[in-house]
Design a protein with these regions (language model features):
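N-terminal alpha-helical interaction blocks
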Residues: 1-147, 153-161, 165-166, 173-181, ...
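Short cysteine/histidine-rich zinc-coordinating motifs and their immediately flanking basic loops
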Residues: 135-145, 167, 180-184, 216-221, ...
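Elongated scaffolding segments in large macromolecular assemblies
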Residues: 187, 649, 658-752
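Charged, low-complexity interaction segments
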Residues: 1-61, 185, 189-198, 204-608, ...
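Short cysteine-rich clusters marking metal-coordination/redox-active sites
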Residues: 123-126, 146-153, 168-169, 203-206, ...
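Subunit-assembly interface segments of extracellular/virion macromolecular structures
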Residues: 121, 166-168, 174-176, 184, ...
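Residue-level signal for mature regions of secreted extracellular proteins and peptides
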Residues: 116-119, 142, 162, 196-199, ...
Length: 752
């Protein structure tokens, strides 16, 4: 018999990538008809650039590898954790996690299949439990349910309700509620651990095979089955088949390695509960070119060192003209040297010419400086005297977590700078790709302002930016973002789960990929991708204020020459921190979830500062734009002291952020957004004392939905902005001075 082809449904792309992702239980409108989504082969390939696909595949590999490493630690368990308990078998090769690029297919979610699930029912009149073995036989079995009626088969109400409670396990399995349960039967006289799985489907007292499902009000703990014949009670109990196969032999007492029954037992949960399905995915900025991101390849470490050295002001090796000419000729760029020499000769002549204008001199000097800068970043890369910390960072970064990689952030910022921030590019209708909020374009100015009022408004904007310690703030249009989902877990969204019966032991949560779909001549796991192009705000903090803030709070920064920017020193500090188990940035930031356990380091503190400032802007923008908190995303560029906050969404960008900025402008206070951010009350918390004790970040103030946050709400603290406390992980235990406090001191000191 050919397999049943499931029906399909259409939902929005964002819903199909999350709430209706493959293997997600759902009910139709009105709560009737419980079903489960299944992978569908009819979705079209996502129109992504090859570099974007490769980056997504690398992120998935990194995510799964880190997940497995954390899940297999087995803290508090009495046996080693098998890798198959942490990730899908399809990800495992040679005893390691390997997500092959060829096993993935990148698709745009447009349609999804679904099947009825669970196939377990209860009589609305008497509570008799019935179930179907499979979809193929469900119709026939359902028609015979009334034959099992314990009262009057002829007068049976034949009115059945689908049970909306399922049995779930952190292995990723979901099963219908059933009176049958599995157990491990040890072989008598066989070798240690020998045995098999057996199922008990009948009453232990009378061997009856019909049961009532009793559902008293209250928690699921009160639910139970009752034998129709003898009324013997049977608890709701099931053991996960996959885990029982693996750990069943370890259930016997007296063994050196032993499993707990609680590791194997499934749990009853509501079909609609979030614990039934946690979708896993990520997002990344989409760029047009990979000139700078291409330097991140392992084969280009020397060029990457040269880029960082040039970008952050490390001194260059002095090359003679003959050496520079030779290198450029070898690279096929000799004509550039000829042009450079010609411009240099002209400059020398003009400098000795009476009446030469400063504008002419500056133009010639700028041409020479630009040529030298370009050469230092490309053909002369690797000849800079980069500090050992920079070389270590470029060499060791292959072991770092991608989203916390300061070197990658530097390359991404350089790309963003060239493609979006500077250069005066337009997107059509005269709109520029990015606009400095100190110098607004016609599309961001409030209507009806006189030139005098406009000048006053921009003056007030500048004043508030100074009070916030912001050196540059821009509205950026057409921020390219790709969001994707690739897998799921049950019962818990993190790599481990704890239960009271195990007294703190951490059990592994299995990360599963979306089920395979047909692709040409084979099958592959779908990665559901959604590309977006929306507005955002780019913010860069003042380097001098950040440096003073670190110094006054006793946070050491690696020593460097006077011309070396703070960003280079932060990269060095981050590289050093990655070698310290107490302060490294692991995938799930376990180090920073422990109270008072991490020393003060510049990398962690600046990351927390930028992250907190980004959340502060998100909460204010959400309140003033009408967008909910989950409609925002964030990206940090720590070495450049910058962050990007943008609108997430697959619907057409209606210019919510630009409209908000335009409508909130006023000559008296510049702009409501900045005025609100400056106002101390915007960072007060309704749970002030409790929040401060927990590090200064809670749902009442800074936390946003985890799906929108870069770190799932770690490395946040109001104290980095306003003082009056310190982050929960800081082991110094003395309150810090807030960044806004120092910025305000400087702004007031410089006020006319």
């Amino acid at each position: 018999m050919s397999p049943i082809k499931p029906p399909t449904m259409v939902r929005s792309r964002s819903q199909l990538g999350s709430a209706y992702a493959p293997h997600h239980p759902f009910t139709f409108e009105g709560g009737e008809g419980a079903c489960m989504t299944v992978p569908w082969s009819g979705n079209r390939d996502a129109a992504l650039k090859e570099i974007t696909k490769r980056t997504i595949a690398e992120q998935i590999q990194e995510y799964c590898e880190a997940w497995a490493a954390r899940a297999t630690q087995g803290t508090g368990l009495r046996h080693p954790v098998d890798l198959t308990q942490a990730v899908d078998q399809s990800m495992i090769s040679g005893g390691a996690v390997r997500v092959r690029y060829g096993d993935l297919v990148f698709q745009t979610p447009e349609i999804v299949g679904y099947v009825p699930f669970p196939l377990a029912f209860v009589c609305k009149r008497c509570g008799l439990h019935r179930s179907c073995d499979s979809l193929k036989t469900a119709e026939k079995e359902f028609a015979n349910f009334h034959a099992a009626c314990p009262n009057d088969r002829q007068g049976c109400a034949n009115d059945w309700q689908q049970i909306d409670v399922v049995m779930a396990h952190w292995s990723g399995d979901l099963e219908p509620l059933t009176p049958s349960y599995r157990h491990w039967h040890a072989s008598q006289g066989g070798p240690p651990g020998a045995g098999e799985i057996r199922t008990i489907s009948t009453c232990m007292s009378c061997s009856g095979d019909r049961f009532y499902l009793k559902r008293p009000p209250g928690s699921f703990a009160g639910w139970h089955f009752e034998c129709v014949s003898c009324h013997t009670v049977r608890p709701i109990l099931q053991r996960d088949r996959r885990t029982l196969e693996l750990l069943g032999p370890l259930l016997q007492a007296g063994q050196t390695t032993q499993a707990f029954p609680a590791e194997i037992n499934m749990e009853p949960i509501s079909y609609r509960a979030s614990a039934a399905h946690y979708t896993h995915g990520d997002q990344l900025l989409v760029f047009d070119e990979d000139r700078w991101l291409g330097l991140l390849a392992e084969s280009r470490i020397q060029e990457l060192c040269g880029f960082l050295a040039t970008q952050y002001g490390y001194p260059t090796t002095q090359l003679s003209d003959a050496e520079r000419e030779r290198i450029l000729r070898e690279q096929g760029r000799h004509q550039e040297w000829v042009n450079y020499k010609g411009s240099r000769d002209v400059l020398r002549m003009v400098e000795n010419t009476p009446g030469a204008t400063q504008q002419m001199l500056d133009g010639l000097r700028g041409t020479l400086q630009q040529a030298e800068k370009d050469w230092n970043e490309t053909v002369f890369a690797g000849r800079q005297q980069a500090a050992p910390g920079i070389l270590e960072a470029c060499t060791a970064r292959s072991r770092w977590i991608r989203r916390y990689d300061f070197v990658r952030m530097a390359a991404e910022h350089k790309t963003l700078e060239e493609e979006k921030l500077h250069g005066g590019r337009e997107i059509g209708d005269g709109k520029k790709v990015s606009v400095d909020v100190r110098v607004l374009d016609p599309f961001l100015k409030p209507d009806g302002l006189s030139p005098a009022d406009e000048a006053r408004m921009l003056e007030q904007v500048s004043r508030r930016l100074d009070l916030l310690g912001i050196a540059e703030m821009r509205l950026v249009r057409n921020v390219g973002v790709c969001e994707y989902t690739f897998g799921y877990t049950r019962t818990e969204s993190k790599p481990t789960v704890q239960r009271d019966k195990l007294q703190g032991a951490e059990m592994p949560v299995k990360l599963r990929l979306h089920g395979r779909v047909k692709v040409r001549d084979g099958a592959a796991h779908p990665v559901l991708c959604i590309e977006q192009s929306n507005e955002g705000f780019y913010v860069r903090l003042d380097e001098a204020i950040v440096l003073e803030w670190l110094t006054r709070n006793g946070v050491a920064v690696p020593a460097a020459g006077p011309d070396v920017a703070l960003g280079g020193r932060l990269i060095e500090d981050f590289a050093d921190a990655q070698n310290d188990n107490a302060s490294r940035f692991s995938r799930f930031l376990d180090e920073y979830r422990r109270d008072r356990s991490v020393p003060r380091r510049a990398a962690a503190y600046v990351f927390t500062l930028l992250h907190t400032a980004a959340h502060h802007l998100i909460t204010v923008a959400s309140a003033m734009s009408g967008l909910d908190l989950s409609s925002f995303g964030e990206h940090l560029f720590v070495p450049d002291l910058a962050f990007l906050v943008y609108r997430r969404g697959t619907t057409m960008d209606l210019g919510n952020l630009s409209s908000m900025w335009r409508e909130r402008g006023h000559p008296s206070f510049g702009n409501d957004v900045l005025d609100r951010m400056v106002n101390p009350s915007s960072l007060r918390c309704g749970s002030e004392s409790v929040c401060n004790q927990r590090g200064g970040a809670c749902p009442d103030c800074l936390l946003i939905p985890e799906s929108a946050c870069l770190t799932r709400n770690e490395l946040l603290s109001r104290s980095v902005l306003i003082g009056r406390g310190l982050p929960r992980w800081d082991d110094v235990r003395t309150s810090i001075i807030g960044y806004f406090e120092i910025a305000a001191e400087r702004a007031l000191a410089n006020a006319p």
